[in-house]
């Protein structure tokens, strides 16, 4: 028995209409279905779901580094940053990063879910860490 891939992502949201607009405008998500408290999208083949949950605390989530990262090309980095600014998306301060670790933009949706647009790959990260993070142990499978 093996895990095949990510099936879908679901985010709890407080305002369905505001969140639909966010995901359409920021991610280019294509709305597939909308109900009273749920919406499903296709994001370039990824199933994204939103469910309304109004009475849950949302004020401390920004202190966690937990996030979902999406790949963007290096050529599109500045354009994507400008788009987020134009859409008045909350852009977060990123961590200090070596250029070999590529570029990232961290931002949140209207409910504080944290995302990253990243120009690197897992292999870029591993290559960089192998050269610079000598305390790390690497495994071959």
UniProtKB/Swiss-Prot annotation:
Primary localization class, coarse: cytoplasm
Top-level taxon in the UniProt lineage: Bacteria
Cofactor(s) required for function per UniProt: Mg(2+)
A GO BP entry: response to antibiotic
UniProt keyword annotation of Metal-binding present: yes
Gene3D superfamilies in alphabetical order: 2,3-Dihydroxybiphenyl 1,2-Dioxygenase, domain 1 (3.10.180.10)
Active-site residues, Swiss-Prot/TrEMBL: 116 (proton donor/acceptor)
Binding site for Mg(2+): 8, 67, 116
Keyword tags: Antibiotic resistance, Cytoplasm, Magnesium, Metal-binding, Transferase
EC number: 2.5.1.-
GO molecular function (one): transferase activity, transferring alkyl or aryl (other than methyl) groups
Cross-referenced NCBIfam families: fosM_gen, PRK04101.1
Family statement: Belongs to the fosfomycin resistance protein family. FosB subfamily.
Protein name: Metallothiol transferase FosB
Lineage, opening ranks: Bacteria, Bacillati, Bacillota, Bacilli, Bacillales
